[in-house]
Design a protein with these regions (language model features):
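Alpha-helical transmembrane segments of multi-pass small-molecule/ion transporters
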Residues: 1-303
Length: 303
């Protein structure tokens, strides 16, 4: 694992957010454009990326390895949801803000940032492991995520049939059955899915364009959430998994994924379903900024 490889990945991501910020001030992004891009990502490019991540690997691991990764995923989310059920009650805020607190603790950025970080730490073979670990994230974030952010009153059962959830179920079935569609299918999905990450980061940057950085940096609540998200939660997961004697590579990938900043999807889902988009964008910015330091440190110290 290379400290500077991980640092470079984080700087690339921060640059994309900065580009979205500038694009908004130049009039290229903002308002209706951001909303349409959000719909494009959630309904077309993201589902393509989810399935492509599972079917484009060179070689599928044994089913026992896949089940082991999913077992780690269960521990991963049990730990997260234990904090989701307790921490937001201790922090002051509106119902919308508490929804953001819950989403922040529940859903790290295991895809957009997690995939390249896993590859930087463990090589190309780590991508499939990271993709399998991300499948529970995809299922939960697109079903429970809107419920957390917008509340039960705005939840609709048809949200469970969103393209991202359908793609996640399909990806899980393909992984467990070891079915592989023709290579051209993977190439097509990968080609479309590849625009997901830069587009999403541009939208986040655009949403931050009219936000006061000082307001974010002076918010104790956002700092508490950021420290929990970036440092405390990965440290706890590392202790638990080491006690379970999990394979070193799986443990390392899981701990690094737990230490990711909050998922960019939260901002997109807030826009789509009526959550507190401003606070969601603020905590996304702060955790992503902090992760430039904490992720390389996690790689060097915990793993």
């Amino acid at each position: 694992m290379n400290f500077f490889d991980v640092l470079e990945e984080m700087l690339v991501i921060l640059f994309a957010i900065a580009a979205g910020y500038v694009a908004n001030h130049l009039g290229y992004l903002g308002g209706e454009t951001d909303q349409k891009l959000s719909k494009l990502i959630l309904n077309i490019t993201m589902p393509a990326m989810i399935v492509a991540a599972v079917i484009t690997g060179e070689e599928l691991p044994e089913i026992s390895v896949i089940l082991s990764i999913l077992e780690v995923g269960v521990v991963f989310y049990v730990l997260e949801f234990a904090l989701v059920l307790t921490v937001p009650k201790l922090l002051p805020g509106t119902a919308g803000e508490r929804g953001v607190y819950r989403y922040t603790l529940a859903f790290p950025n295991v895809g957009f940032i997690g995939y390249p970080v896993a590859v930087a730490l463990y090589g190309d073979g780590a991508l499939f492991y990271a993709a399998i670990l991300a499948l529970p994230f995809n299922l939960l974030s697109y079903s429970l995520g809107p419920l957390m952010l917008a509340g039960a009153a705005r939840f609709r059962w048809r949200q469970l049939l969103s393209p991202c959830i359908v793609a996640s179920v399909l990806g899980l079935v393909l992984a467990l059955t070891r079915l592989r569609p023709p290579a051209i299918v993977g190439e097509m999905l990968d080609f479309v899915g590849d625009i997901t990450v830069p587009l999403s980061l541009l939208v986040v940057g655009s949403l931050l364009a009219h936000m006061s950085p000082g307001k974010v940096l002076r918010s104790p609540k956002l700092w508490v959430l950021s420290v929990l998200r970036l440092l405390v939660m990965p440290a706890l997961l590392c202790l638990v998994l080491r006690g379970m004697h999990i394979e070193a590579m799986v443990l390392g990938i899981a701990v690094s994924q737990m230490g990711m900043p909050v998922a960019v999807n939260g901002t997109l889902l807030s826009m789509e379903y009526g959550g507190d988009t401003e606070v969601m964008a603020q905590v996304t910015f702060l955790t992503t900024l902090g992760a430039i330091i904490t992720i390389p440190v996690l790689a060097a110290v915990l793993l």
